[in-house]
Amino acid sequence: RTLDDAIDGADLFMGLSGPGVLTQDMVKKMADKPLILAMANPTPEIMPELAKAVRPDAILATGRSDYPNQVNNVLCFPFIFRGALDCGASTINEEMKKACVKAIADLAMKEATDVVAEAYAGEELTFGPEYLIPKPFDARLIEEVPVAVVKAAMESGVATRPIEDLEAYRKSLHEFVNAAGLFMQPMIEAAKQGPK
C-alpha cells in the first residue's frame, strides 16, 4: 500500500520524512478539516500554502517559525528538564511527558499576555486553526510546564525531592522569566526582523 492509497479519507497526516512527500492531489483526498503535521525541516512534506490552496479547511503545523503552529521541541525540553531536576526525578516517565504536553495544550487555550502579543505582533494568538500551540517565546511556559512535570513526578513516585509548596515553586520559576528578559529581548527583536 502506498501513501497515496492510505491518505484517502484520512483525518491526519503526520510527516517526519522529507520535502514534497505529500502532494496537493493527496491533500484533496483527505477527510474534512484534515490535520496536516508536516514536520520535515527545513522543507516540510508539503508547504502550507500548497495545502491551503487545495484545502482551505486544512489545519497545518510545521517545524518552521515562518508559519503558524510551529512545532518546536523548545516548547517542552527545557521545561520538562527543569521540573525533573528540581524534584530530583529518578527518570522522566510517561506521566511526566503527558503532564508536559497537557500543560502546553492548556496554555494555548489561555489568552495571550501583553508581552507575548508584543513579541508576536500581527500574529493570531487566540486558540484555533492558526494557533494550536503556544509560541516558543511565551514566558508562561516556564511557570506552567515545570510545575505540571513536578506534580506528575511526585504522583508517580519518581521524585526523590518532592516539592511541598507548588505555588511557591511556581513563583520561584517566575524569577527565570525576569532574569531571561534582558537576554531574550534581542532574540525576539531578531525573530521579528527575519522570521526564518
Q: Which residue stretches match the model-derived regions?
A:
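Glycine-rich, charged/polar anion/phosphate-binding loops
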Residues: 1, 20-23, 46-47, 62-63, ...
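A general structural motif
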Residues: 17-19, 64-68, 179-180
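Short, conserved loop/helix-junction motifs that constitute active-site signature segments
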Residues: 27-33, 52-55
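Adenosine-phosphate binding glycine-rich loop
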Residues: 38-146, 150-157, 161
